[in-house]
Swiss-Prot record:
GO BP annotation list: arachidonate secretion; lipid catabolic process; negative regulation of T cell proliferation; phospholipid metabolic process
Claim: Iron-sulfur is one of the keywords in the record: no
A GO CC annotation given for this chain: extracellular region
Physiological role: Snake venom phospholipase A2 (PLA2) that shows very low inhibition of ADP-induced platelet aggregation in platelet-rich plasma of human, rabbit and guinea pig. In vivo, shows efficient edema-inducing activities in rat paws. PLA2 catalyzes the calcium-dependent hydrolysis of the 2-acyl groups in 3-sn-phosphoglycerides.
Reactions the enzyme catalyzes: a 1,2-diacyl-sn-glycero-3-phosphocholine + H2O = a 1-acyl-sn-glycero-3-phosphocholine + a fatty acid + H(+)
Tissue: Expressed by the venom gland.
UniProt KW keywords: Calcium, Disulfide bond, Hemostasis impairing toxin, Hydrolase, Lipid degradation, Lipid metabolism, Metal-binding, Platelet aggregation inhibiting toxin, Secreted, Signal, Toxin
Residues at which Ca(2+) binds: Y43, G45, G47, D64
Descriptive protein name: Acidic phospholipase A2 Cvv-E6f
Length: 138
């Protein structure tokens, strides 16, 4: 219960896509994005640098690249509409920005689900100083 309260406090003031992304991860990967991926490897969490450490970290790298390609919108705050049908996420907006951000989040959530076996606790709260290699291009 205390953990749920902490997560609720952390989400206060956060709008749009980040909250929706968290809910999407929970629905698809059956785990909390904040808890499992909030500070993982070199790319999961705020910012990102260096090279992804494993397949899970690569999910975050690709997500960061996808957000970076979103045009004429702020991916972290835009709200979008999606549904879940037969366990699959369907992005429903016609607006190009909302659709693109939803697709970025959908691909990342599926990537997390598909790469649960690669998750390595050694990369949780991974020190940024270990992420100094030359980054690969998006």
């Amino acid at each position: 219960m205390r953990t749920l309260w902490i997560v609720a406090v952390l989400l206060l003031g956060v709008e749009g896509s980040l909250v929706q992304f968290e809910m999407m991860i929970i629905k698809v990967a059956k785990r909390s994005g904040l808890f499992w991926y909030g500070a993982y490897g070199c790319y999961c969490g705020w910012g990102g640098q260096g090279r992804p450490q494993d397949a899970t970290d690569r999910c975050c790298f690709v997500h960061d690249c996808c957000y970076g390609k979103a045009t004429d919108c702020n991916p972290k705050t835009v709200s979008y509409t999606y549904s879940v049908k037969n366990g699959e996420i369907i992005c429903e907006d016609d607006d190009p920005c909302k659709k693109q951000v939803c697709e970025c989040d959908r691909v990342a959530a599926v990537c997390f689900r598909d790469n649960i076996p690669s998750y390595n606790n050694n990369y949780k709260r991974f020190p940024a100083e270990n992420c100094r290699e030359e980054p690969e291009p998006c």
